[in-house]
């Protein structure tokens, strides 16, 4: 009988290398928020991948960056804390970009960990094969990696192969979660992240990091209908106007797109009500950050 493997795997990397895309690809559901804007992942998102012979819990950390405010400090603390008490680390980089100072900063952190570190070069669909080997050799000159695997999370290229390689390094163990559980976050958290994703897609560069979403109420009104009320927090009146849009058009579009994804997540019809409120300088208010769901692990 084949042994059952289980383990916790941390995904770390600079902003926008495709960590959330990878998590959503291997889980088969949208759990982690995806956007082309940096720093969109704020909490550790645990995606649970269950196969017949293994269960892998992926922890998608906020992208490593230099903090600019209290929320940034929190995001960095989460990323670093995630490196402890796990079975493997995926260091994800863009195959189509030069090695940057952010990558070097992460490599210096990783040199001190005893956990197996896998270098995963993402976005190989954007790179000519001849360019791949020199990039791999360049990374190898910085440190010894347990394994190096090129993938495309968006296209699904080589992802299954990477999972097979990863499994060989994980310990034997039981299933930590039921077969049908794909995340350890409550549904309300995932719903809030879906709403935030739609705002990021529809608004300009001024808005992204000033957006916080809190799901105030989520009630199953009948077997096939869920009523959700959520508040979108911004820092300035001008941002409130951008999110709402002329005649409320932008907010309606956010609601329409979010409702579609939430209905797929919950398997029910959804009645979604959204409000936009100004909470000045909220990213520097620790208590407010906690109030809207960004909570550090307690030691």
UniProtKB/Swiss-Prot annotation:
It holds the Pfam family KH_2. Monomer. Residues 151-153 are annotated as: G5. The gene is era. HAMAP family: GTPase_Era. Keywords: Cell membrane, Cytoplasm, GTP-binding, Membrane, Nucleotide-binding, Ribosome biogenesis, RNA-binding, rRNA-binding. The keyword Nucleotidyltransferase does not apply. GTP binds at residues 13-20, 60-64, 122-125. Residues 5-172 form the Era-type G domain. It is a peripheral membrane protein. This is GTPase Era. NCBIfam families: era, PRK00089.1, small_GTP. Residues 60-63 are annotated as: G3. One of its GO terms (molecular function) is GTPase activity. Belongs to the TRAFAC class TrmE-Era-EngA-EngB-Septin-like GTPase superfamily. Era GTPase family. It is found in: Cytoplasm; Cell membrane. An essential GTPase that binds both GDP and GTP, with rapid nucleotide exchange. Plays a role in 16S rRNA processing and 30S ribosomal subunit biogenesis and possibly also in cell cycle regulation and energy metabolism.
